[in-house]
């Protein structure tokens, strides 16, 4: 979208602007179309990053040993249930609860859902990875961490992830960007 290419900085206001832009650009022809969103703005000198998300697209900090730490909080029914019932696990709930509870929609309304925003510091040897749920729904955290330990560069790691996901019977869209420090 044109708006993203013109932004100098991201903040919570970015989501409200994107909702308006999405509705203006797509509302007439694609009314009700929806998307999740994740973005990062990184200051390469201070290694500080602003992380912004809506829905179940995620940001991860990956350490030098290949351990993945989820930065963002999913805006899904399941995530809300897990917050309300801390003694339960994902497997304890029906898969229908994985639905997104917050997203950007081309429907001419103002954005009124949940926004995740956090500022983090990235250390030398760490990587920041942004992805759609096609990556995390298709590969468990254990599989992703094993891939990170087994391969020594991000291109190989992400290629293996893509191939494993493509082999599965179902396939969701898969978008990934990684920045290593």
For each feature predicted by the language model, list its residue ranges.
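PP2C/PPM-type serine/threonine phosphatase catalytic domain
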Residues: 1-181
């Amino acid at each position: 979208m044109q708006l993203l290419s013109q932004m100098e900085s991201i903040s919570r206001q970015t989501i409200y602007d994107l909702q308006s832009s999405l509705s203006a650009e797509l509302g007439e022809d694609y009314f009700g179309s929806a998307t999740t969103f994740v973005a990062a703005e990184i200051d390469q000198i201070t290694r500080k990053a602003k992380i912004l998300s809506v829905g179940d697209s995620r940001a991860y900090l990956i350490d030098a040993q290949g351990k993945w730490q989820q930065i963002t909080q999913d805006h899904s029914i399941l995530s809300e249930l897990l917050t309300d019932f801390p003694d339960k696990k994902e497997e304890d709930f029906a898969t229908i609860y994985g639905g997104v509870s917050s997203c950007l929609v081309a429907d001419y309304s103002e954005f009124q859902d949940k926004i995740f925003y956090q500022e983090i510091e990235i250390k030398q040897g760490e990587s920041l990875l942004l992805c759609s749920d096609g990556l995390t729904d298709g590969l468990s955290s254990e599989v992703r961490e094993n891939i990170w330990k087994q391969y020594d560069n991000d291109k190989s790691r992400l290629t293996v992830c893509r191939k494993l996901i493509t082999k599965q019977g179902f396939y969701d869209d898969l978008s990934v960007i990684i920045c290593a420090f």
